[in-house]
Amino acid sequence: MTATLRPYLNAVRATLQAALCLENFSSQVVERHNKPEVEVRSSKELLLQPVVISRNEKEKVLIEGSINSVRVSIAVKQADEIEKILCHKFMRFMMMRAENFFILRRKPVEGYDISFLITNFHTEQMYKHKLVDFVIHFMEEIDKEISEMKLSVNARARIVAEEFLKNF
């Protein structure tokens, strides 16, 4: 793991642990409704200040909290065109299977690659520290996966180019 990744992930972990102090909060507008306030944005007093944790200009995390929900949006490192394409395809693959990941949003926040929505119901049903561990582990693994896919694509392209050039 690189020297800058560990402090970045530690900052995200600490911020998520602080933001996951959620409680049940019924809607102030409709009786017997309970919607994530971070999504609905019905009243300003229920929203916390959004926090952006940035490793560099392209790799950052936006944590938006409210009284009953937290939205975590992640921008993954995309150094070149191959990484952009791989990241887009991988995120699309993940979001198509959002129903299998209870906290994954189908559509990311504008300017980010993937978003998670954690509500008070998730923190009641699952351990908070396990939710935080999942997000951190996801951030570690996504970087590794995209790097491995890039190496695989480059190796495959090299083999194809060699085979093509054998004919000349």
Curated annotation (Swiss-Prot):
Family statement drawn from the similarity comment of this UniProt entry: Belongs to the ARPC4 family.
One GO term (biological process): Arp2/3 complex-mediated actin nucleation
GO cellular-component term (any): Arp2/3 protein complex
The UniProt record lists the keyword Cytoplasm: yes
Highest classification ranks of the organism: Eukaryota, Metazoa, Chordata, Craniata, Vertebrata
One function term, GO molecular function aspect: actin filament binding
Database matches in Pfam families: ARPC4
Gene3D superfamilies for this protein: 3.30.1460.20
Organism of provenance: Xenopus laevis (African clawed frog)
Its biological purpose: Actin-binding component of the Arp2/3 complex, a multiprotein complex that mediates actin polymerization upon stimulation by nucleation-promoting factor (NPF). The Arp2/3 complex mediates the formation of branched actin networks in the cytoplasm, providing the force for cell motility. In addition to its role in the cytoplasmic cytoskeleton, the Arp2/3 complex also promotes actin polymerization in the nucleus, thereby regulating gene transcription and repair of damaged DNA.
Quaternary assembly: Component of the Arp2/3 complex composed of actr2/arp2, actr3/arp3, arpc1 (arpc1a or arpc1b), arpc2, arpc3, arpc4 and arpc5.
Subcellular locations according to the entry: Cytoplasm, Cytoskeleton; Cell projection; Nucleus
Chain ranges passing through the membrane: none
Protein name stated in the entry: Actin-related protein 2/3 complex subunit 4
Key words of the record: Actin-binding, Cell projection, Cytoplasm, Cytoskeleton, Nucleus
